[in-house]
């Protein structure tokens, strides 16, 4: 096991489980037998899904992966029914419960649940430990289960490995755009070697990270409990986010992050919490994996701290402030420095690692990720994939996770919170929609009268 993978394994805590949780909602009832066969066949190329973690018996030794000689797919697939009335609230409760439940550490660290009774369709919920891979790899794994058509057969990838034809069409472009909001910050993962030579700049950035003051105390920070809450929005039109970006010379990423920041401000205001002059930081993943290694599992990403200017009242000023911050981070080797810190933490004794987590965790309030997903609808086990949402773990002592995902022309927001800190994350989701509509209204006033070229202009905006 690599030192960075070991670092994520060591972050596991009963109050903050290191799982990536994904929810895929289907337009009809899926067949459990077909799903098991699909999982068994398409996860087979990823050997890590057939390996369990063996923890060291001697102090100072690294954990390692060991093949599960008696691997049985049935140990990793559950078929359950959603409690009545089978609505969004019932699904949110179930997702929250499973997100709060640890994986079985005696087996490979992943599990898939087929949930029936959600309206007229099924839901596939996947829980995968972060030590297996980072977000870019795990999104690839989850979408490798999908197809471009209801009856598509698996396409060949790298010799005898199989994956989805729908995924093959989408993955290279997604990796090129950057699979997460931070991963867009590093325009070319191949720059890793160039940045690695910038020793002086790296030392400066490390000093900057160490010198950052702790994030201010807000309702989003505090002692964590074991119960988490997971919620998500309905899809919002991606083209509208593009038009907002066009109006203010910003990328879609800039607009999405600004909208999320405005939602947090609105939430604090409704709780009568102070916002004047308040800025918080989000820990943002940055992809460091070269494009020709996008198929590999493992953790190959760094983290940057992105300032979210909650205290700015004007939504346009917030957007411009975030754009400037993200533009600055694009030219920074901060993600590589953070990757190096994670590498060292993974090699350190557990006590030292936990001290490091506590130290760096105090400097942020949230984890923020944004995945530009497939632009066309996909199918899973013969059923159309209506919507997708995921949540990454909140590393260290963070209790707020913000996930943004685009799929088939829509954008959804997912929020995961510690129930003891924020028991009503659905209010943040509502505020996201309100902030989006406010930005859209301002952009409409600024834009020229609508023309036939508006949709073309929207498509021209970059991530």
What is the predicted function of each stretch?
Residues 1-4, 11-14, 19-398, 402-463:
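Soluble acyl-CoA-dependent acyltransferase catalytic core bearing the H(X)4D motif
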